[in-house]
Regions:
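Conserved DEDDh/DEDDy metal-dependent 3′-5′ exonuclease domain
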Residues: 9-178, 362
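Polymerase palm active-site segment centered on the conserved acidic dipeptide of motif C
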Residues: 52, 80-83, 220-251, 428-429, ...
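Conserved catalytic core of nucleic-acid polymerases
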Residues: 203, 392-547, 586, 590-600
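Function-dense linear segments that define catalytic or interfacial modules
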Residues: 123-124, 129-132, 142, 155-166, ...
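C-terminal structured "cap/appendage" subdomains that terminate the fold
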Residues: 526-586
Length: 600
């Protein structure tokens, strides 16, 4: 049954409908007005969904529908159970949307946010504590999502219409009764926009030069070996290590056997880690470190990786928005967040196109200055490198000292050079330091903290609570008390960093969301060299292809590269205003335009 609304819907809730094999899959859409009241229902075949969505999106522009009629109205917010479930098929059909509300992402925020005054209904809907539709296998995904212990792993959220509508009603009630609904809505809109960006970047793919990748591997490791063998330069380096250890048979890939060989050679180390090995000056150490670096490249981004993740000149990783509890993104496949610098030359634009790359200088310290209202810290970095600004202000002697001090303040370093420098920040930037110190104290006491837009940290687990209870027993030992103090300190360092890293992640989401819309407003390129491998939505217009915490890369027609660069700058400025208003903090960019995305 189809009941079309008389007015343009403010929101459209999508979900699957029950049906038989012979009927084919059907999709239900519930149209809602601005007050959340139902104004219509639509029942259509799954294959008809792209045209329906296209009609709704084009109608907002006064465009022509797929049936040829003129349409006018506001673009709706599409309510998805999970963006990776619904958006990729639309993109494959050449349809993009302006905005959505991702129920899975929003559920994770609302179930924990301190702003939600009545979270019981949302928390009780445990079916929505799940991995995204395109996540890795459970044993991999569990580490990414930080689902509360004891709740178990749920493969996917419900996608049927009634369950989706019920969750949307729960979430709407939680938002409307929150202590600051506006702040919460902003966070959920940014998080949902991030879900759209992740799907779009996977659909478009990162332009990747397979021949250049192979050339780099061959130069560093030797020619591609047959089957699973090691390349010749690695084999030669391994022999160099064995000769220096005077052990011709040691297996360098076995930590236990390698450690035994090192000790037999008089190298007294506790492990085979890079940091441990660097403490020795034995002649075997330098080639061993080189071998380990080669082995990492081969296993993480070698020829097998190239075969699996790059196809038709595109690298398509699986991004996981909100995959880290702070709101940072993770990746459940392809290693998008760990591309080594030596492979960056393989990021190559299509012919007639350019890669526009930009990263933010000192994003987290700037976010700290803005959220704490520390005008002195903001002034130190305004319009320039923040670390150099600390030197000019006389806080520290060198830029390196400034970096060590700031990172120490955000991560809770109390020893070494950082421990000696942090007190200078406390003296010069009391507001910023008070914010992170207060967050750390809350964590030590077992409390939770929130980011600027109200993403709230998870409480300590049962193991932490058990340690604290043991230390407070009348018969507690010194060892019990030491373990409790250590656990409290670890939790304090976590909450100290949570507020800063999480707020920086919110700024980055706002940057992405604004940039995505600015790029979509650029005119389509009508030249003779479309980026066909980027898919039907993006083959003729500038689009995001890569994001890493504080860095974006846009693939743009050469004629639009300067416009794309200006869009990146404007979006960064807009993100700062959106989150922090007129706070005297800027977010300067290191921006470049080229055929390759080489990072120095």
């Amino acid at each position: 049954m189809t009941s079309a609304p008389d007015q343009p819907p403010a929101a459209c809730v999508l979900g699957t409908l029950p049906g038989t094999v012979f009927e084919g899959r059907r999709i239900g859409i519930v149209d809602l007005d601005r007050e959340g009241r139902e104004i219509g229902r639509i029942d259509l075949a799954e294959e008809a969904l792209p045209d329906h969505v296209r009609d709704r999106e084009n109608g907002a522009r006064g465009g022509q529908s797929a049936s040829g009629g003129e349409q006018n109205g506001a673009r709706p917010r599409w309510v998805f159970s999970d963006t990776p479930k619904w958006y990729p098929p639309l993109l494959a059909a050449g349809v993009s949307i302006e905005r959505c509300h991702d129920l899975r992402l929003a559920h994770a925020i609302l179930a924990r946010s301190e702003l939600v005054t009545a979270p019981e209904a949302v928390r009780a809907a445990a079916d929505w504590d799940a991995a995204p539709a395109d996540a890795a296998a459970p044993e991999q995904a569990a580490a990414l999502f930080d689902v509360d212990a004891g709740r178990g792993f749920i493969p996917q959220v419900p996608h049927d219409l009634e369950a989706t509508l019920a969750e949307y009603v729960r979430q709407t009630a939680a938002i409307e009764t929150a202590s600051d609904p506006g702040r919460l809505r902003l966070l959920l809109a940014a998080e949902s926009a991030g879900g759209l960006v992740a799907a779009e970047m996977r659909a478009a793919g990162v332009p990747w030069d397979e021949a250049e990748h192979d050339r780099i591997l061959t130069e560093l490791l030797g020619p591609r070996p047959i089957r699973d063998g090691k390349p010749e330069k690695m084999l030669a380096k391994a022999e160099e290590v064995r000769a220096a250890l005077d052990d011709p048979r040691v297996n360098l890939d076995s930590p236990n056997r390698l450690l035994a060989a090192l000790r037999n050679a008089g190298i007294n180390v506790a492990s085979t880690s890079k940091w441990e090995l660097q403490t020795s000056e034995h002649p075997a150490i330098e080639p061993l470190l080189e071998y380990k670096k080669m082995a990492r490249l081969l296993s993480a981004n070698g020829w097998h990786w190239l075969d699996e993740w790059v196809d038709e000149g595109r690298y398509r990783p699986v991004y996981v928005p909100g995959g880290v509890v702070t709101g940072r993104w993770a990746a459940s496949g392809g290693g998008a967040l760990q591309i080594p610098r030596q492979l960056r030359p393989a990021l190559r634009a299509d012919e007639g196109w350019r890669l526009v790359s930009a990263d933010v200088a000192q994003l987290e310290p700037r976010a700290l200055a803005a959220m704490s209202g520390d005008r002195a810290m903001a002034a130190a970095g305004y319009g320039r490198d923040l670390y150099s600004g600390l030197v000019d202000a006389g806080v520290v002697a060198t830029r390196q000292e400034a970096k060590i001090a700031v990172l120490g303040a955000m991560y809770g370093s109390t020893t070494g050079e950082a421990g000696a420098l942090v007190p200078r920040l406390q003296q010069n930037f009391p507001a910023a330091m008070h914010l992170v110190d207060s967050a750390a104290e809350a964590g030590r006491q077992g409390g939770v903290v929130s980011t600027w837009l109200s993403r709230t940290s998870p409480p300590p687990g049962e193991g932490w609570q058990r340690l604290q209870r043991a230390a407070n027993r009348f018969d507690a030992t010194g060892a019990d008390e030491q373990r409790a103090r250590r656990a409290a300190g670890d939790q304090g360092r976590f909450t100290r960093n949570f507020v800063v890293q999480g707020t920086a992640a919110e700024w980055a989401l706002a940057w992405l969301a604004d940039l995505r819309l600015r790029l979509a407003r650029l005119p389509e390129f009508d030249g003779t060299r479309p980026a066909a491998a980027s898919g039907p939505v993006f083959s003729r217009r500038a689009h995001l292809v890569f994001f890493l915490h504080d860095e974006v890369i846009v693939h743009a027609p050469a004629e639009q590269a300067d416009q794309a660069a200006e869009a990146i700058r404007a979006a960064a400025a807009a993100a700062g205003r959106l989150l922090f208003g007129d706070a005297p903090v800027d977010f300067p960019l290191d921006l470049s335009i080229g055929e390759r995305a080489i990072k120095e």
